[in-house]
Amino acid sequence: MSLHVVILAAGKGTRMRSSLPKVLHPVAGRPMVSHVIDTARSLNAEKIHLVYGHGGEAMQARLNDADVEWVLQAEQLGTGHAVAQAMPTIPDHAKVLVLYGDTPLISPVTLETLLTIQPANGIGLLTVSLANPTGYGRILRADGQVVGIVEQKDATAEQQLINEVNTGVLVAPAKQLKQWLSGLTNLNAQGEYYLTDVIAAAHHSGSSIQTAQPVCAQEVEGANNRLQLAQLERFYQKRAAEQLMLEGVTLLDPARFDLRGTLQCGEDVLLDVNVIIEGQVELGHRVQIGAGCVLKNCRIADDSIISPYSIIEGSVLAEGCTVGPFARLRPGAELAAQAHVGNFVELKNARLGLGSKAGHLSYLGDSEIGANVNIGAGTITCNYDGANKHKTIIEDDVFVGSDTQLVAPVRVAKGATLGAGSTITRDVGEDELVLTRVRQHHITGWHRPVKQKK
């Protein structure tokens, strides 16, 4: 039986007080609904149906590569009505799993359990027991069997004492679900068509309803306001940090670590406080990342050390590199083994060769730098002429003195020495010494100007 997943994402999210649709608000750097889509995809669903309404253009623009079937709910008439909009394109022989775009923490393990316990021709329902169930629909049972769900606003005082609540997540056979949805009414306090009412309909039709509980209660929490969004973020990060530590990564303070992508680590990796990981990041064995660093879409090989407050994006570092503090590697930066990039050095689309060093206050853009090169403090590759970028090539064993400007396109051949304060506009030959400084003048008896009194 094929699996179709319906994700409800049509709500406006008024309490967010935002023009952005609620499900596009980020957790771990990605829209909440993107997490749900990825979880659904991990279940090998044949098709994912995304029910949208408010902010449809923004959602389609943000999720244009999500590979989902877009289902419009023009009027928000309740969760039952929302699911009904997706049903016409779902074959009768399929099973339907209903998820929510604002519950990004739901795990594949929990959903696989739910799919396993679903009875034939019946409903698998995800419930959770809460110490404070206020606001949630209560699970009604008779002789231990689920017979219905009552929403908070429709519950009696006695029913409000029930602590087993509905998460909204359920799986049901498509043919029967279509029948149950067609019988829904909006005779309730909200005047809406509740998806929860299909539970009573299934019970009355003689279908079995089995329940499962999530791995942890926080998985099924949603976000209706910024406070709840922040709480989801913290739980996500706590879970991510715990998993990394179980895999052998040292986090000096797990509460001050943010994972906004994926992180693959070798053995004995150490991350100091306030490190942020974005995109896909790979760290080799014994890599150390200092406090306040931001790593995005990069690979850092064994025994490299990144000192505090460095930013590395779209870059590849070989073994034993040292970077920072306060360095910036922009997309296209490559460091060969044992290369060193020091404080306030910026690389963009540049390769620094084996054992080469750029220790201080330099910009190296669109550059190819060989092995055993010393880049003096204040060196600038002038790569942009106002219209086009040009390349600087510095071959092996070159010594570049401090405060040197290399006006690209230019090549400095092997073993050359560039004197401090030089502006290099022409190619330099092998083992040449180049100086372009003006002659130093000495004026004796010089008196500084005196400030005139007003």
From Swiss-Prot:
Q: Where is this region: Linker?
A: 227-247
Record's subcellular location: Cytoplasm
State the function annotated in the UniProt record.
Catalyzes the last two sequential reactions in the de novo biosynthetic pathway for UDP-N-acetylglucosamine (UDP-GlcNAc). The C-terminal domain catalyzes the transfer of acetyl group from acetyl coenzyme A to glucosamine-1-phosphate (GlcN-1-P) to produce N-acetylglucosamine-1-phosphate (GlcNAc-1-P), which is converted into UDP-GlcNAc by the transfer of uridine 5-monophosphate (from uridine 5-triphosphate), a reaction catalyzed by the N-terminal domain.
Where is the organism placed in the taxonomic lineage, from the top? Bacteria, Pseudomonadati, Pseudomonadota, Gammaproteobacteria, Aeromonadales
Instruction: Name the segments for region: N-acetyltransferase.
Output: 248-454
Pathway stated in the Swiss-Prot or TrEMBL entry: Nucleotide-sugar biosynthesis; UDP-N-acetyl-alpha-D-glucosamine biosynthesis; N-acetyl-alpha-D-glucosamine 1-phosphate from alpha-D-glucosamine 6-phosphate (route II): step 2/2; Nucleotide-sugar biosynthesis; UDP-N-acetyl-alpha-D-glucosamine biosynthesis; UDP-N-acetyl-alpha-D-glucosamine from N-acetyl-alpha-D-glucosamine 1-phosphate: step 1/1; Bacterial outer membrane biogenesis; LPS lipid A biosynthesis
The protein's name is Bifunctional protein GlmU
Q: Which GO terms describe its molecular function?
A: glucosamine-1-phosphate N-acetyltransferase activity; magnesium ion binding; UDP-N-acetylglucosamine diphosphorylase activity
Q: Reaction catalysed? A: alpha-D-glucosamine 1-phosphate + acetyl-CoA = N-acetyl-alpha-D-glucosamine 1-phosphate + CoA + H(+); N-acetyl-alpha-D-glucosamine 1-phosphate + UTP + H(+) = UDP-N-acetyl-alpha-D-glucosamine + diphosphate
- What keywords are annotated for this sequence in UniProt? Acyltransferase, Cell shape, Cell wall biogenesis/degradation, Cytoplasm, Magnesium, Metal-binding, Multifunctional enzyme, Nucleotidyltransferase, Peptidoglycan synthesis, Repeat, Transferase
